[in-house]
């Protein structure tokens, strides 16, 4: 692919694209007014924050006759982001075709019936635009960033890509080699490896337990028919959202959608492909390698899907645990109690909590990198903090976590691309864009009592999934880890 021509980003895992958690990017909350204790500034700050929330542009949504949803937010910028969010990912695959969705994403920019690969790259470059794509376990996304005046061309290119890709045999063979090399690179990224293992043990023998890239033998055998069958089965109007943000007119976007997708994307004529259930299993995977300098460990319990009422509360609990790295500094002044204990005891190099949500299940847990001698101590402190969430978390801690969560969520909506991503994801997950004031109210409704109740429901005395790689001789056995999921009385 020509340099700076077509940017393609691969999301290896819904859980891993940003360890802050998939749901944290889905549920975009409002910002409470930051209290500035300088006389009248406190009131003005609160009023200003409220005014920002009220001034957020409306998200307009229209559904075409074929089921395709068109959603946009017009902020009047000179640039825009427009994309297709498709309810199709590796979870809809089986053992034989696992890896097809990701393979298809690789083929997206390799030429269509109207444009060769070179023509496509030159057109994008001449527009000053960028094309991007990624695959997760439940979604596939194609989007473009361009000048607002080029919105019609961007939509036409996206329509051409998903409806008219040539999927030539030569290009398939070339991308097969690219994906195999990509798999080798993933194997050197221990964070990626650990999260693949975590899904494999948590969702054994189910679609969520399989990797997005697929096994090597599948990559070597996937052919054009497999790719065409996947498109024919899953790329249907009711499962696609055309989302846009920036300087976009919803009426113009709607007309473009009708012209490019109104007749070509049909509804399901037969039975709609069902989302296979994925049962969580408390279990472990250990890959011991004493030659490695550091131990990499992930521990998680089963959480909930996107639309579950407890999602917000689990996100606040996730923020309470927080994240830490040796470069942070701060010492005992860190907001996270776990970060204070970790820093004071020099227990690990870094840790990061996560809350990964899917349609009907999720993983709530922590990923950490430790010295071999401190693995057991670090895990003990983590589990002790989890138990504290269930029994004795304070109102002041919860209030601080709520403010931090709302701030982080708002900060992520910086520019047309993250806003467009938020629109696309929320439309697939909730069939609407949840207003910021509503999310702000839902976060504010959480208190310490609710945190204790919900954490007891999902964490206390639950069997976790554990994935560990490296020098993990000191890691306690699984039965001991499970016993520490209960409060230990002295």
Curated annotation (Swiss-Prot):
Any one GO CC term of the record: mitochondrial matrix
Domain of life per record: Eukaryota
Requisite cofactors: Zn(2+)
Regulation: Binding to PMPCA is required for catalytic activity.
EC number: 3.4.24.64
PANTHER family: METALLOPROTEASE, MITOCHONDRIAL-PROCESSING PEPTIDASE SUBUNIT BETA
Protein name per UniProt: Mitochondrial-processing peptidase subunit beta
Species the sequence originates in: Bos taurus
